[in-house]
Amino acid sequence: MKKLITTSALLILFFNLSVFAASNSSSKTKGWWNVPYPGTFDTSQLVNEQAFIRVKGNKLVDEKGTTFIFRGVNIADPDKLRTENQWSLSLFEELKDWGANVVRLPIHPISWQKNGKEEYFKIIDQAVIWANSLDMYLIIDWHSIGYLPDELFQHPMYDTTKKETFAFWKDVSFRYAGVATIAVYELFNEPTDQGGRAGKANWHDWKTINEQLIDVIYAHDKNVIPLIAGFNWAYDLRPIKQHPVARKGIAYAVHPYPQKAKPKVKSKQNFFDLWESVWGFAAKDYPVIATELGWVSADGLGAHIPVINDGSYGPQIMEFMQERNISWVVWAFDPLWSPTMIKDWNFTPTEQGSFFKKQLQQHK
């Protein structure tokens, strides 16, 4: 009996030591020194082999050299949509049905920070899979507003740092290298010093930081198009006349909302002249993508400067861009983010939504 008790005690002790060792081993496995290197996107999940879109002179072209125009929409930050239970394949199917060939993902620094990159990559992965299945392209936009060199921003949701911005593009370009579905990287949404309230914008510094970002991206992936915005909330490209960003394969972004141009007499020609002088001229030498545009009436939901218009803006801006092969992406396919394209999640079009849906349908 005594021998049996001793044997049992030894067995229990051995079992407990084994459990402790396993637990300790598991704990070690979770240590920072055992975190694996980042992985790349699994392209076996994609069903369509899409053409890479490239820069050729002042045009975007497909692999056959045919001119390609992006025509599409902005959605809200994917994290917002997921929180509202609106992040789904059916959303992308609706965008395709409207006629979009590109979807812009405005990734806010605050949502990136809240989720962490591993969790947010899962969201982007879903967008890539869904867009690819519908033969649509994606623009990834680091959606901050302010002046990055001075790290001063318009709202806490846009707060970031140079280090975080460089790390974001390093990680994104590594993960999605060679994935044709992600065609464009919009390096910084809307640079502005807010009239001195966010530092003092200097084109040399802005040009330099964009060139450095492009170098990081190109070290991982040269098949993507870096997109650079000018000052005044991505409206003013005049500095590139004398000092263009010194990197190949790039395009320029513009957000030509209706109240940005202020002619004394509001004729179509006067608007055209102002647009041409501030940003339209760039299309003679580089691809230009209007990654935000749209309008809302003065009494409409979320009406604010610079997006208020009586509707005359729509036909005029479309004519201007079409004459110059400028790609366009409307803001925003969301019932809350103004100017809105839809009134609700039944996808009922607003005034501008109806207009731009017709424009998209012409190219389906």
What is the predicted role of each segment?
Residues 21-102, 358-360:
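N-terminal carbohydrate-binding accessory modules
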Residues 77-79, 109-113, 146-148, 191, ...:
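Feature marks short, surface-exposed loop/turn motifs that line or immediately flank catalytic pockets
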